[in-house]
């Protein structure tokens, strides 16, 4: 099912953005770990999340209660693989709307991934670091602005 890292990373974006947390938890190993490095005060996450179910809950279910129309994009289709099981400094961009005040959010940062090969040959995520460098809050813009931005970019 998840035989290569590129496919797995596309599934990560789709399941996270579309609030499919039950599917998202299946792409992480049960004892997976997600850590955060956040260089902005406009968004917050716990310092670390342990376990695939908790990861899916925070990154998908809880996140999608606060934001909607979430779309995450990889800034390059060339994944910077260090080896078969590690991808480092994968640039990303997210465009979404905050439900509470309808402000548009635009953020960017880096992902680092470590994968584990399973007995069945599939890859799963064992460690994931999310660095958030910028998270702009753009209040007062019409919803059409969000749609226009998202329509210009290939998803995921």
Could you tell me what each predicted segment is?
Residues 1-14, 18, 22, 26, ...:
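Short, low-complexity N-terminal intrinsically disordered segments enriched in polar/charged residues
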Residues 2-10, 98-104, 114-156:
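Terminal "cap-and-tail" regions of soluble proteins that handle hydrophobic small molecules
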Residues 12, 16, 43, 47, ...:
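Conserved aromatic-histidine-acidic binding/catalytic patches
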Residues 30-91:
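A solvent-exposed, acidic/Ser-Thr-rich amphipathic alpha-helical stretch
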Residues 51, 107-109, 154:
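Glycine-centered flexibility motif
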Residues 63-69, 99-106:
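Short, solvent-exposed secondary-structure boundary motifs
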Residues 73-79, 108-117:
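Hydrophobic/aromatic beta-strand elements that line small-molecule binding cavities or substrate pockets
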Residues 78, 84-92, 103-110, 127-135:
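Eukaryotic helix-grip
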């Amino acid at each position: 099912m998840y035989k290569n890292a590129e496919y797995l990373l596309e599934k990560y974006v789709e399941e996270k953005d579309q609030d499919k947390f039950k599917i998202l938890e299946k792409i992480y190993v049960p004892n997976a770990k997600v850590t955060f490095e956040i260089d902005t005060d406009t968004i917050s996450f716990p310092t670390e999340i342990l376990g695939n179910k908790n990861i899916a809950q925070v990154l998908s279910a809880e996140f999608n209660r606060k934001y909607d129309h979430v779309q995450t994009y990889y800034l390059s289709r060339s994944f910077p693989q260090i080896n078969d099981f590690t991808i480092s400094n994968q640039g990303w961009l997210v465009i979404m709307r905050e439900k509470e005040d309808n402000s548009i959010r635009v953020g960017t940062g880096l992902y680092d991934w470590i994968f584990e090969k399973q007995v069945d040959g599939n890859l799963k995520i064992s460690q994931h670091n999310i660095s958030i460098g910028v998270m702009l809050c753009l209040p007062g813009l019409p919803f059409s602005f969000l749609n226009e931005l998202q329509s210009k970019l290939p998803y995921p």
